[in-house]
Amino acid sequence: MIKFYFTTFHMKFPARLFSTSFTLNNTNIINEKDVKYITKNFLLENSNGFNLIKNIINSDETSEVKQNKIEVELNNIWHTEITDILQKKRSLGLDAIGSSILAKDFHNLIGDIENFINKGRTNKLPGVEYLKPSLIISIVLGKVIPFSLRHSDIFNQPTHSLFAEIGKILKYQSIFELHHRIGLIQNRVEEIKNYTEKKLVSEFNKLTKVLDEYKNTLKNLEELSGESIIKVGLGFTALLSETSEFYSLEEQIIAKNKSIRYIIPKNKLKTLINNITLMDTIELPMIIPPLEWKIDDNEKIIEYGGTILNNKHRIRPLRTKSVENSDANDMTYNKELVDAVNFKSKIPYTINLKILDFITRDEFINRDKKDNVIIYKHIHPDSALLGEYMKDRKNPKISEITTHNSKFLYHSSIISIAKLMKDVKEFYMTVFIDWRGRFYTSSCALNIQGGELARSLLLFKEGQKLNDIGLKALKIYTANAFGLDKRSKEERLDWVEQNLHKIIDIDNYEIWREADEPLLFLACALELKGYNEDPNFISHLPILMDATCNGLQHLSAMVNDFVLAEKVNLLKSTENDNPRDLYSEVIPHIKQEILEASKSYEHTNLERINVERCLVKRGLMTITYGATERGIYDQIVSKFFQKDEWNKTVGLHFVCIDSDIAPKDVVFTQKNILLLSKIIYNSLFKIHPNLNTLMVYFNSIVKVLCELDLPVNWVTPYGLVIQQKYNKFTKYNETTYVASKRYKLVLRKADTTSISKQKQIQAFIPNFVHSMDGSNIVLLINTIRDEGRKINFASIHDCFATHANDTAWLSWYVKQSFIRIYSDSSFLRRFHNYIQLRIQAKYGEDAHFDKDGVLTHVTIDNGTDIPDRIDIPKPLVVNKDNKIYKEILHSEYFIN
């Protein structure tokens, strides 16, 4: 019963908290310059943790019983492994010497924990003294070790979130232990309460006193404040940092009154990883269909879905909580949304055994065409030196090591889960949403929303014999994975036909290593090989189709911008046409702007910039998701430039690290790159003034609502009411002491009575567009369900997947759902009318309308004879010509 609470607090982390059990052998790190990797012992399948889950999966019990056991035992892996080390148990193939060293280390740590608790240095966590020290160690290491590997940007590690997570888990473990003890005592008290024997009366009195103490401790524990929980997490994290050689909690001063705190590996981390089943997970794929979510007539959740333990104990809500937009946590649901969640979670998957076998062969060449590692299979050999490298924040080894280790943790987790699931007949992914109604699949590395490795290892359980449509879709997807998605479909099909003999020669490493996505290309090649050998071949591979500049697709449809719609593939096109590429089409305008800017003496060097698609794509793509000029500047600098020198008289200078963008001997000032960022940012709005008009309208609406002290509310096309209200936060300091060392915490507290104007404006457009993404999926799922069509379906926000034979149907459903959202010119007017209603509901007669029923202004009493007047922006008038919606169904590249 205790263990299930481990899962509760992964929710605050991004969806990339990947996980499973894996154990490395103790061979030396292999030279990564060598093109071949030894993979036989990469993941030991006889480790204690691995076998714990594997034995449950392979047992003769019912699937429901096995699923329940998996959920319970999964969260105890770290404790199991540490207990095994303490008892000097180990799995075959593990490092005997290292295991003995670790046993001694852990015995010492237990003494440190006991001393820490006995001296009252528990940072005000009532009840923690009742927990086993080995459990406390397992909780801390189970969070800190993966954390130290996971985050590739070491200078932006969310350490406060880590401390909060550890503190919360310790809190709830203490609560469980107290409930357990209270239950035992109550049972005994009930047994002896009526006895008059002196000995039993004495026992009764002692037990009731202890019971009162436990209940009082429990009350204090349940009322523990957020900052106290963070202090607890920091305390135990710092203690193990001071007393172990696994990791180090460091603090670095970066400016006056400003410092960063980060966690880095220490000397014995590799030994630990080589002798333990590393866990970093919320859940594994389910071997039974996830339980359904259910709501009542008031649109409140009455039955939790997903995992069995989630259904029983309500651990994780359907909607992930938002700290910044806290009011969203109380928003209601609706039937259409909940039905869509239940539909998506019922799609069964299996492991692509051919891919799993291929990538774990001894002879697997683990390098792509650019000599980049495809799968990261070992911790970076210089990880223990990271602390030394951190003395110089500019040292490129920092990024090299942290990026490597982050990918290592991710890839290892994916392959470990695949190995666990490879013999499972079928498995499922739980589905959750955020407050905008956007869908997220399972907090597990192996899911359809994961990276290329995860997607290459997943197959739909229900396969089909390929028909003509399916074979064509598979060939196009193969070409896409190779990197030909910017060509016409006709050209892609021709390329596959011309190279088919090479593609299906699976042992021909050269062709798939040339692909942009080599593992997905390999998965496609295996399907084509199967069909080529037998036309009755049953295909299971999910075919992914990606929307083109999806944010701009939505915005262009809102304002009926025919020119922009054409550039983002909303209009009629054929298989002989190339898909339009907005990013490339903006380049001539940007070049012209740079040419004009370079006529100024201080910006002469800008003419040395070669404007490539890669330079502008990310900035243009993220404008609709809230990117600012400064944000684009940060993107460009981080990817293409490095600091050259700091001269206080002339400012910050950079050199380009990509010779395709600029010569490496040309020095650019910060002003140069800021101007370049401004040109990129403004290019979209200068070319498409309707887009600028829409952005100005949305921003002005949000500004007025902030002045009126109102959140932004809107209704999705399927009827869900969404509210955005970002609070202001105030910072305050807290101090705690661990092992005579002082730790200062800078914490934030939300002022729920105030609204952050800056955050409201910056976040609204991306949040609004994301809610339309989610709406598109809800509408298409409900259409599929209502029509009774049996179709495998998965989605990654604006990317859609189905069986090859069903791609034409899915494309049609996606387009139809998009048309339903924007099919008439009243979309923005409906949005405006709802805003008016919200204002009128609060201000009543102080909200003033014109003769046409349009809200013009609000008057606010300021204590004088003349009230304040706040003008309301007029509704945005858009072109009523619906040519866009007439053509979407005939677009070959709406999703590509």
UniProtKB/Swiss-Prot annotation:
First-level EC class: transferase
Protein name in UniProt? Probable DNA-directed RNA polymerase
Q: Which organism is it from?
A: Neurospora crassa
Function statement: DNA-dependent RNA polymerase catalyzes the transcription of DNA into RNA using the four ribonucleoside triphosphates as substrates.
TM ranges: none
Give the record's family classification: Belongs to the phage and mitochondrial RNA polymerase family.
Q: Name one GO molecular function term.
A: DNA-directed RNA polymerase activity
For this UniProt record, the keywords arranged alphabetically read as follows:
DNA-directed RNA polymerase, Mitochondrion, Nucleotidyltransferase, Plasmid, Transcription, Transferase
Compartments it resides in: Mitochondrion
EC number(s)?
Answer: 2.7.7.6
